[in-house]
Every structure is written in structure tokens, then in C-alpha cells.
């Protein structure tokens, strides 16, 4: 299955708890970390919920 790389570009400080949980669910938590995850509709939805905190890296 295809994978995508996601980089955290925003801090979870002063963000709602639900956004923090989505960030942890993606495997992130600290600034400028990059993780490689499977490209599924669930992951795409999580990325869409946090456009101000994560970016897709080529």
C-alpha cells in the first residue's frame, strides 16, 4: 500500500484536546517530526482536520 510522509509544523499548545489526540494518533507530538504512514482515507481525514499543524512532505 502507498505511504505518505507527514511533518508537524504547528504546536499543540493552546489547542483543543481533540486536535491533540488526532496529532498523537498520526504518530506526531513534537515540532518538526516526520512520520511515514499508510495512505488511507482515515489518515487523509485526520490531515484535513489539522491543516494548520501538519503538512504532507514529498
Swiss-Prot record:
Q: Which SUPFAM superfamilies match?
A: Ribosomal protein L30p/L7e
**Which branch of life, at top level?**
Bacteria
Tell me the GO BP annotations in alphabetical order: translation
- What's an example of a GO molecular-function annotation for this chain? structural constituent of ribosome
Keywords in alphabetical order: Ribonucleoprotein, Ribosomal protein
What would be one Pfam family of this protein? Answer: Ribosomal_L30
Q: Which CDD domains match?
A: Ribosomal_L30
Q: List the disulfide bonds.
A: none
A single GO CC term for this protein reads: large ribosomal subunit
Similarity section: Belongs to the universal ribosomal protein uL30 family.
Q: How does it assemble?
A: Part of the 50S ribosomal subunit.
This protein is called Large ribosomal subunit protein uL30
Q: What is the organism of origin for this protein?
A: Novosphingobium aromaticivorans (strain ATCC 700278 / DSM 12444 / CCUG 56034 / CIP 105152 / NBRC 16084 / F199)
